[in-house]
Every structure is written in C-alpha cells, then in structure tokens.
C-alpha cells in the first residue's frame, strides 16, 4: 500500500532547486554521475533501459560510463562504451533519447586510458605522457612499455576528443564531460608520477596541465555553444607522488573559464579511494575536500561521497560544500530515490548498503545490485524497479517458509502482485535470516539496511503477514491451508570442513566437537573457545565471513591464525575494493595469515595440510573455526516434494525452493531469485527462469549479422 504523498521535508527542498550549468538547466540537484555498467555500446538496449530508469526516477542528469574516444583507448573486455564513429553514435542516441523521454539531461564522459588502456581489440601501442609503464599489475593491464606521445600524437588524440564531442552533441547529449580523473590520460599528464616530460607538457603544474587545458578548450570551441562542458577531476589522488588538494585548487583556477561544471572525485587508478565500501569509509568522507574546491571555483561543483541520506545531501548543498549531489551507487540501489524524496516517501528508499557487489559484478561483465534485483534487468526481463504486473489469478494463498533475503524478496513481490494472502513464516524472532548476524561483524552494520527496507515494506502490505518464532514441519505445511508453498530455509556452514579444494570433509573433524566452531555458532549461538586460547580460522570462502570472524575473535582477545587456500586473504574482497583494508586491519590486530594452504586433516591441538609447493603444513591450535562452504538446508523441501499425493490432498498446487536452500550464493543472486519467482509466478514452470532478451547481434536468414535495434 502506497503511503499518502506529502511535499518534501523543508530541509530537503534545497535538493529540488533548479540550477544552470552553461546553456543547460538541471531540474534538481541530484546528478547520476558517470559509472560503469558493463553494458555500454555493445548492449545498447540494456544500457539505454538501465539509464532510462534513473531518468524516470527523477535524477536531473543521467550519465554514461567513460566513453572511449578512439581505438588507441580500446578498453575491451571492460564492455565500456565507445564513440569512435557514426555506428557508435547511433547506439548512443538510443540512450540519449531514452533519458530525454523522462525529462532528464544526458551526459557523456569522454575518455582516453593512456597507459592503462587495454587495447586488446585494436592492438595499438599504449600512449603515455613520458613512457612510464602502467602501475597496474598483470593481468589487469598488459605488460609493456608505452609509446611516449609526440606532438602529432597529442594533436591526434585531442582531435579524437573533439570528434567524439561533436558526435555526442549531434545525437543530443546535453553535457560533455572530459575525464581527467582515475589516473587516465589527462590525469597522467597532470601527475608528476607519470609525467616526466621536459617540453611544454611537463615540469611545472601549469605545463603538466597543458594537455588537459588544450583539450578542454578545443572541446569547448567545438560544442560549448550547444552543450555544457564538464570535467571530472580528482581533488586528491591520495598517493605519495600524486596530486594534492593545493594542486587541484590551482588547476581549478586555471580551467574555470573553460568549464561549466566541476565533477569531483577522490583517488587515482586505485579507485577504491573513491568508491570504497561502507566497511572502509563513512558516508560523506570527502565533502570537506570538495568544499575547498567549491570555494575556489566560479562554476558549480558536483561531488560524490557515498551519499545515501537525503538529510546529509541537503546539508552538504546548504552548507556550500557542493552545489549538486553526485550519486552512482545510490542510483543503482534505488533509481527512484529523487522521486521518493520529492514525494516525502523517504521511508521507501532502498538505501545503498555499500557492499560493492555492483563493482564486483561490473568487473565480471554485468552490473547487478544486492539491494535492487531489477538493476540491469529493465530491458532483459522487462522489470520496472517500482511496478509489478498484477497476477492473472490473484486468489492464491502463499506460504513462504524462511524470512531470509530470498524469502523476504519473494513474499514482498507476490504481495505487490496482489496475491490474496502471503504468510512469511520464520523460526527466528526477527526478519533477515543469515544476514542479520552478519551485521554484527566489524564494519558490516550497513548490510542490515537490506532487512530494514524490507521490514518497512512488509509493514505496508495488508496482504502480507510476517509470523515469527514459528517452526513448521512438513505436516504443519500440509495442514496450513496454503495453495502455494515457497521454501526459503537458507543454508548453514559445513561443520565438517567440506571444502572446494578437496571436495571432502577434513579428516578427524567431528561435527559438534567442542573445539570445532562454525560462524553460526559464534554469531547466533554465542559459543566461544576457551578464553585466551589459540584459534585458527580456516577460510576457504575468501570473502567477508572468514576475515570477519577472525577480526571478531582478535578484537575479543584471542590469538588468531587465519589459514586460506587462496593466493590472498579475503581474495574475493579485492573485487569489492576492500581486500587491502581487511588485510591491513587483520595485520594490525595481530592475526597471523597463512596463504595458499590447503588443509586436509585436524585434531584437537593441531591442523595439517599442504602449502603452495606441496610442502607439509602443520599448526598448533586450541580451536578451529570452519568457514569453508555453505550447505543447503533443504530437508523440509525434499520431504514435501517426495509425497505428491499428500500435497494434492492438502490442496497445495506447487512447492518451490529458492535462495540458499536451493543453492547457497552471494546476496545479490539469492535476492534476484526470490524476485524472479515473484515476477514469474504464473509462468509454466517458475522453477526455471524465462528466457531473457539478448543483444546486440543476431543471426539472420542469409547468415549475416544484424542489430536488433535496426
């Protein structure tokens, strides 16, 4: 049930004041800044539909990710966007028109990677200010020494920026943003770390800025009468040889006449400085730095700082730290954030948890979100972030057993589709399943925003009832009176040390032994090893749990060893840009870390395994915490589906198993599955996902290829 609309709170009204940037006017102060999706111009319909949802949700500006200006900055396989030629421009036009259809301005970020460009399709040599190789280690960037850009190279690349800007203007972009941050080509010229030139493009700050200033000037001359000109600039690169805030203030004064908008961030190629997860940086950390630039600039400033609270956003604008609020992750989690604030429905906001699943999924080729299952599915599956189709047969009663992430998502979706009755039943007292105790780990408190949002939505839906502290067996379910049953009973960590590396339990480990622990026993049951004892955490998962419980135990005074078969502790956390921070924290807490060790056996007092080169490994320990694999808790489902006659007699038409009970996976995946079940509840077989739309190329009858957008 939708709440009664009220005007935005008085302290939020500043967010909805229009502001001029050059020849364009923003309808409010909420700016969807450049951010990657991995869709780009290779999946233009997916890309356009994703951006259009943000425009429909009320953002004043919707931006592309970085768009490569010519083949010397080919970024394959990053699946970013290109604007090299008219074919690319046609694909951009689809996105621009989709954004304009909802009243937002469209912005493009023009990019050249310089020494960091991947060039795997173009196979051109990397270009650089002065022949300094990429500081990205293989395989992130190909090895090799880049070409020092000649004057001809400089002019050619600058012309590529101009040509790209003209193409952007011609397809309707309102804002052209020249990327001078994140350690790419313009930033490489600005940086004394990369720029060792002795000509007019190196040496002093003014000389190092010359390439960037000339590029801005040429772009402005070409399209500045039609488009607003912006540039994305790091206020600090946060490295020992980088760009300081004082440098940035000087750069802003140099370039202020050439731009209409300053698009600010923090950090360089280590973009974790700018978009670290909530475990690492607090909301609004960079605002004071932006304020220093704002005081030096004559043009408006947009800044990003992991802002999710409309209160803090409004305060930042009112206090003059920024003029416009930049957001990427919050727009992924809730495309309709602006509309909800405008309508006074802040309680309905899906607040970004800052877990950076979006970053890890982007790097794997498809941006998705743990908080918002519809992100990236707007075209592929036709899902709208706020609207559901009504069930063709709403006279159904659905029993959802298990109120973890998948169960909550399925129950809410079915209730929003108009099911007569949805009961969400859990043996625990509170919503959340395994996610609730995760919030007790250091730095992961904001993960429980997932639960908070769904708790509010459940309270608003009159046809959805949460029934806590109720454990149901198969007989209870058959007697319940529901026409449909969804089993979402989750998973539990293996108590025997079953691992991916051996596909077997640890020899000598007996589940339930008083010296063996699982994360559930530590976080839910409150069990602990003997005070002051030596504890080993065996982490075969490699994400948040192993490092999290190691940190917890170290903070409680235990002597902790963390053993992992992976090449790095918390290796998966590198994908979410928090691995280094996790390892630094563990090291600072005295946790001894042992990498590339595969355990095979354990007994009270000692564990056994092999190292990277098959050398024997042994370690004395008083207690062993097993963070290896999660095992589905699917016994209830299996018992139900074994007896089809009993289900038929009970009037149960279908039983579905979802989430970790089906297959233990990351939060985003089980959330997606619960959401998909609700969306496809009346499909011929809801257990199997309906086909999604694929693009951009399809075979045609004559054997050639065609674009589905033609």
Put a short name on every predicted segment.
Residues 448-494, 511-514, 518-527, 531-533, ...:
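A Rossmann-like FAD-binding core segment of flavoenzymes
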Residues 75, 314-315, 338-339, 411-413, ...:
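Short amphipathic alpha-helical segments
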Residues 379-391, 457-460, 466, 494-556, ...:
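Glycine-rich dinucleotide-binding loop and its adjacent helix/turn
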Residues 334, 339-340, 410-412, 549, ...:
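Internal hydrophobic alpha-helix adjacent to the cofactor/substrate pocket in enzyme cavities
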Residues 353-366, 476, 482-509:
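Helix-enriched interaction subdomains in cytosolic or periplasmic regions
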Residues 1-401, 405, 409-416, 422, ...:
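Flavin-dependent oxidoreductase catalytic cores
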Residues 262, 393-465, 537-577, 581, ...:
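Beta1-alpha1 glycine-rich phosphate/pyrophosphate-binding loop at the start
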Residues 572-575, 661-663, 683-710:
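Active-site-proximal substrate-binding core of FAD-dependent oxidoreductases
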């Amino acid at each position: 049930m939708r709440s009664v609309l009220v005007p935005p709170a008085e302290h939020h009204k500043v967010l909805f004041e229009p502001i001029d940037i050059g020849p364009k006017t923003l309808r409010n102060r909420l700016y969807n800044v450049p951010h990657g999706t991995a869709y780009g111009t290779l999946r233009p319909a997916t890309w356009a539909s994703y951006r259009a949802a943000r425009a429909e949700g009320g953002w004043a500006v919707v931006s592309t990710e970085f768009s490569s200006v010519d083949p010397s900055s080919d970024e394959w396989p990053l699946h970013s966007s290109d604007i090299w030629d008219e074919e690319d421009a046609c694909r951009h036009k689809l996105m621009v028109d989709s954004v304009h259809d909802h009243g937002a301005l469209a912005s493009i970020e023009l990019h050249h990677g310089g020494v960091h460009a991947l060039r795997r399709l173009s196979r051109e040599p990397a270009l650089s200010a002065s022949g300094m190789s990429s500081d990205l280690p293989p395989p992130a960037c190909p090895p090799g020494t880049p070409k020092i850009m000649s004057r001809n190279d400089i002019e050619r690349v600058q012309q590529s920026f101009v040509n790209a800007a003209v193409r952007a203007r011609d397809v309707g972009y309102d804002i052209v943003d020249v990327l001078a941050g994140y350690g790419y080509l313009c930033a490489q010229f600005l940086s004394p770390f990369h720029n060792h030139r002795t000509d007019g493009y190196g040496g002093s700050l003014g000389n190092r800025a010359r390439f960037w200033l000339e590029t801005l000037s040429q772009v402005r001359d070409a399209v500045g009468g039609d488009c607003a000109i912006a540039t994305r600039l790091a206020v600090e690169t946060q490295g020992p040889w980088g760009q300081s805030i004082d440098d940035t203030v000087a750069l802003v004064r140099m370039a202020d006449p050439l731009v209409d908008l300053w698009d600010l961030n923090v950090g360089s190629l280590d973009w974790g400085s700018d978009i670290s997860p909530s475990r690492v940086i607090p909301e609004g950390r960079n605002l004071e730095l932006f304020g220093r630039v704002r005081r030096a600039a004559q043009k408006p400033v947009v800044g990003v700082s992991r802002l999710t609270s409309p209160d803090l956003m409004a305060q930042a604008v009112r206090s003059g730290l920024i003029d416009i609020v930049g957001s990427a992750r919050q727009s992924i989690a809730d495309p309709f954030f602006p509309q909800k604030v405008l309508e006074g429905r802040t309680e309905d906001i899906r607040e970004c948890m800052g877990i950076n699943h979006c970053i890890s999924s982007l790097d794997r080729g498809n941006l998705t979100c743990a908080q918002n299952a519809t992100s990236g599915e707007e075209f592929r599956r036709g899902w709208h972030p706020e609207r559901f189709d009504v069930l063709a047969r709403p006279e159904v009663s659905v029993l959802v057993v298990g109120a973890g992430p998948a169960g909550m998502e399925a129950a809410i979706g079915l209730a929003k589709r108009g099911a007569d009755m949805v009961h969400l039943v859990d043996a625990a007292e509170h919503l959340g399943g395994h996610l609730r105790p995760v919030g007790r780990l250091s730095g992961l408190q904001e993960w429980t925003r997932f639960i908070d949002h769904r708790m509010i939505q459940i309270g608003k839906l009159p046809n959805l009832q949460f029934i806590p502290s109720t454990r149901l067996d198969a007989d209870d379910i058959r007697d319940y009176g529901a026409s449909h049953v969804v089993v979402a009973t989750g998973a539990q960590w293996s108590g025997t040390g079953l691992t991916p590396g051996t596909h077997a339990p640890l020899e000598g480990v007996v589940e339930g032994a008083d010296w063996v622990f699982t994360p559930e026993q530590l976080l839910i049951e409150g069990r602990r090893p003997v005070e002051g004892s030596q504890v080993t955490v065996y982490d075969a998962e490699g994400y948040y749990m192993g490092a999290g419980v190691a940190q917890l135990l170290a903070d409680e005074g235990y002597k902790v060893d963390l053993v992992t078969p992976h090449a790095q502790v918390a290796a998966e956390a590198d994908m979410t840009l928090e691995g280094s921070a996790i390892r630094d924290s563990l090291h600072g807490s005295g946790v001894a870390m042992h990498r590339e060790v595969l355990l095979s056996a354990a007994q009270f007092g000692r564990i056994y395994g092999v190292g990277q080169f098959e050398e024997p490994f042994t370690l004395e320990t008083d207690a062993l915490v097993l963070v290896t694999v999660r095992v589905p808790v699917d016994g209830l489902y299996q018992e139900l589906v074994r007896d089809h006659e009993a289900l038929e007699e009970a009037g149960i038409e279908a039983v579905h198993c979802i989430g970790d009970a089906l297959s233990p996976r990351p939060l985003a995946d089980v959330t997606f599955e619960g959401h998909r079940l609700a969306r496809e509840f009346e499909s011929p077989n809801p257990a199997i996902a309906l086909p999604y739309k694929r693009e951009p190329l399809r075979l045609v009858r004559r054997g050639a290829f065609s674009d589905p957008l033609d």
